[in-house]
Swiss-Prot record:
Recorded family membership: Belongs to the pantothenate synthetase family.
Single GO term (MF): pantoate-beta-alanine ligase activity
Additional notes on this entry: The reaction proceeds by a bi uni uni bi ping pong mechanism.
Name of this protein: Pantothenate synthetase
A single Gene Ontology CC term: cytosol
Reactions that this protein is recorded to catalyse: (R)-pantoate + beta-alanine + ATP = (R)-pantothenate + AMP + diphosphate + H(+)
Enzyme class: ligase
Length: 293
C-alpha cells in the first residue's frame, strides 16, 4: 500500500491506472477506522481494480463548540488496518494540503442539508458536501462508498452528484453493528464502560419504532413521542433529535400510511452524541439502492 500526502502526488500515482482503463473505488473517511469502514473497503475492493481510502478530519464540517480537537486520530493504526485489507492507496492530506488558503467556494445542498442533523449543526453538511466534492475532483473515482449509518449524508451526496453531473457511482453500504446492535462509530471510543452499556438503548429504540409501526402506529407525532419515552427509560441517554421522514426527500410526513419511512435518532450519552438511522416499512426505498450518477 502506498501512503500519499499531497494532491499532486496522488494524481501522479493514479495516472497509470487511468491510462489502463482501470476502475477506481474510493472510500472517504475521517480515520480512526472500525468494522464499518472496513466493510466499505471490502466492497470497494470487490467491485473495482484499484482501491483508495482517504483519511482527513475535515474542519469545515465541525462547529465552533464541537469535537474537532479531540476527534480520535491514529494514522499508524489506520494504515496497518488498510494494509491488512489490501488497499492500494491511502491518501492522508493535511489541512494545509486540502485548504492552502481560506475557502471561498462552498458546496451546499439545501434544503436537504438544513434538516434533521442540519437543524442542530448549521453548516455541517455544507462542510461535508464541499470536502467530498473536492475529493471527487482530486481522485476522480468510478465509485465511492458511504455507510448508511450516516443516511442523511448519503442522501445529500447522491443529490449533489446528480445535480452537478459528477461521473461517480455512489454506493450505500448497510450499517455495520457491534454484537449488541450498537452502530459502529469512531466516536464510540469516547464512551465509558457504563455509557457503552447504556448506549444500546439507541438501536433498541429503532427496534421499538419498527415494532410500533408494524403494529399500526401511523401518526408520526405519536411515533416520535413513543420513541422519546422509550429512550427516556435509560437515564444516561438524552434524545436530542427524533425524526420521522421521507427517506428520499427527508421531508416531514403528515401521515405515514404504511409507506417506508426513515427513523433518524441523535442521542447524547454522556458527552458523546450517537447517530443511528433505520428505514422501516414494507419495502426498501430507492435511495438505499446503488445507482449511477
Amino acid at each position: 500500500m502506498q501512503i500519499i500526502h499531497t494532491i499532486e502526488e496522488l494524481r501522479q500515482a493514479l495516472a497509470p491506472a487511468r491510462q489502463q482503463g482501470k476502475k477506481i473505488g474510493f472510500v472517504p473517511t475521517m480515520g480512526y477506522l472500525h468494522k464499518g469502514h472496513l466493510e466499505l473497503v471490502r466492497r470497494a475492493r470487490v467491485e473495482n481494480d484499484v482501491t483508495l481510502v482517504s483519511i482527513f478530519v475535515n474542519p469545515l464540517q465541525f462547529g465552533a463548540n464541537e469535537d474537532l480537537g479531540r476527534y480520535p486520530r491514529d494514522l499508524e493504526r489506520d494504515a496497518g488496518l488498510l494494509h491488512d485489507a489490501q488497499v492500494d492507496y491511502l491518501f492522508a492530506p493535511t489541512v494545509s494540503d486540502m485548504y492552502p488558503r481560506p475557502m471561498q467556494t462552498v458546496v451546499d445542498v439545501p434544503p436537504l442539508g438544513n434538516q434533521i442533523e442540519g437543524e442542530a449543526r448549521p453548516g455541517h453538511f455544507a462542510g461535508v458536501a464541499t470536502v467530498v466534492s473536492k475529493l471527487f475532483n482530486i481522485v476522480g473515482p468510478d465509485a465511492a462508498y458511504f455507510g448508511e449509518k450516516d443516511f442523511q449524508q448519503l442522501v445529500i451526496i447522491r443529490r449533489m452528484v446528480d445535480d452537478m453531473a459528477i461521473p461517480v457511482r455512489i454506493v450505500g453500504v448497510e450499517t455495520v453493528r457491534e454484537d449488541d446492535g450498537l452502530a459502529c462509530s469512531s466516536r464510540n471510543v469516547y464512551l465509558t464502560p457504563e455509557q457503552r452499556r447504556a448506549a444500546i438503548i439507541v438501536p433498541q429504540a429503532l427496534d421499538e419504532a419498527d415494532r410500533l409501526y408494524r403494529s399500526g402506529m401511523d401518526d408520526p407525532d405519536a411515533l416520535e413521542a413513543a420513541i422519546r419515552t422509550f429512550i427516556g427509560r435509560q437515564p444516561l441517554a438524552v434524545p436530542e433529535v427524533i425524526a420521522i421522514r421521507d427517506p428520499e426527500t427527508l421531508e416531514r410526513l403528515p401521515a405515514l400510511q404504511g409507506r417506508p419511512i426513515l427513523v433518524a435518532l441523535f442521542v447524547r450519552v454522556g458527552a458523546t452524541r450517537l447517530l443511528d438511522n433505520r428505514v422501516i416499512g414494507h419495502a426498501a426505498p430507492q435511495i438505499t439502492q446503488e445507482r449511477a450518477a
